[in-house]
């Protein structure tokens, strides 16, 4: 299922408001928005279920996209319908078959936990998820083995299209703040949380701009401390 015309128009309006809001915060944000350009996030136009997104997220952890796609294609090929495996299929799937797809033992454990959580109702449907707040979803989904806060934040941003999410523990975000505020070293998670409060209710847009800083001409990599 894809978004209808009215929903797409709402997204466009939200993008424009985000740019205006961030540009008006201070000179640092004004400069960053001007350098990066218009806010063009990778919004999900398909209404995929949280179960599917979480399975994909865990399956691709610590892998290059090419390797992750190869593993996932093998995984889908062993499904009864040749499409995305159902929670029941993953729950009942033989360990060695999943290993043959390329999954580590740890990932298999996590994938089966996600399947069980979907069957039990802990993982909500897309419709149910849209009625829950960001923190309610984070609290609920991080109970599942292999699912951390960052993974849920990516679900909120890229699948549920939430406008006010700041992945404060993301290293690229922290590096973005180092660039934005011209800091001598990478700031802490708490620094990001504190200084991103002014970006509400458009912290997702702020995160997008911070992610883009590494592509700017005057961006410099953080200096690593010298080994003695």
Swiss-Prot record:
One of its GO terms (biological process) is base-excision repair, AP site formation. It holds the Pfam family HhH-GPD. SUPFAM superfamilies: DNA-glycosylase. Keywords: DNA damage, DNA repair, Hydrolase. One of its GO terms (molecular function) is alkylbase DNA N-glycosylase activity. The record marks 150 as: Determinant for substrate specificity and/or activity. InterPro entries: Alkylbase_DNA_Glycosylase/TA, Alkylbase_DNA_glycsylse_CS, DNA_glycosylase, HhH-GPD_domain. The active site is at 170 (proton acceptor). It catalyses: Hydrolysis of alkylated DNA, releasing 3-methyladenine, 3-methylguanine, 7-methylguanine and 7-methyladenine. One of its GO terms (cellular component) is protein-DNA complex. PROSITE patterns: ALKYLBASE_DNA_GLYCOS. Its EC number is 3.2.2.21. The keyword Protein biosynthesis does not apply. Belongs to the alkylbase DNA glycosidase AlkA family. Hydrolysis of the deoxyribose N-glycosidic bond to excise 3-methyladenine or 7-methyladenine from the damaged DNA polymer formed by alkylation lesions. Can release ethylated and propylated bases from DNA in addition to 3-methyladenine. This is DNA-3-methyladenine glycosylase 1. It comes from Schizosaccharomyces pombe (strain 972 / ATCC 24843) (Fission yeast).
């Amino acid at each position: 299922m894809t978004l209808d015309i009215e929903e797409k128009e709402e997204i466009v309006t939200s993008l424009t408001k985000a740019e205006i809001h961030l540009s008006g915060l201070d000179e640092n944000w004004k400069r960053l928005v001007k350098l990066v350009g218009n806010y063009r996030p990778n919004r999900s136009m398909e209404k995929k279920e949280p179960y599917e997104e979480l399975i994909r997220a865990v399956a691709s952890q610590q892998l290059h996209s090419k390797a992750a796609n190869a593993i996932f294609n093998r995984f889908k090929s062993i499904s009864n319908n040749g499409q995305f495996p159902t929670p029941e299929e993953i729950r009942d799937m033989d360990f060695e078959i999943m290993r043959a797809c390329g999954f580590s033992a740890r990932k298999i454990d996590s994938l089966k936990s996600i399947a069980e959580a979907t069957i039990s109702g802990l993982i909500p449907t897309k419709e149910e998820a849209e009625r829950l707040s960001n923190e309610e979803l984070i609290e609920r989904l991080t109970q599942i083995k292999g699912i951390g806060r960052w993974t849920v934040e990516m679900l909120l941003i890229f699948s549920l299209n939430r406008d006010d999410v700041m992945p404060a523990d993301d290293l690229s975000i922290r590096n973005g703040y180092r660039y934005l505020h011209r800091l001598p070293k990478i700031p802490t998670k708490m620094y990001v949380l504190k200084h991103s409060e002014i970006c509400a209710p458009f912290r997702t847009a702020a995160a997008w701009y911070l992610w883009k800083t590494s592509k700017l001409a005057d961006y410099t990599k953080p200096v690593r401390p010298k080994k003695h």
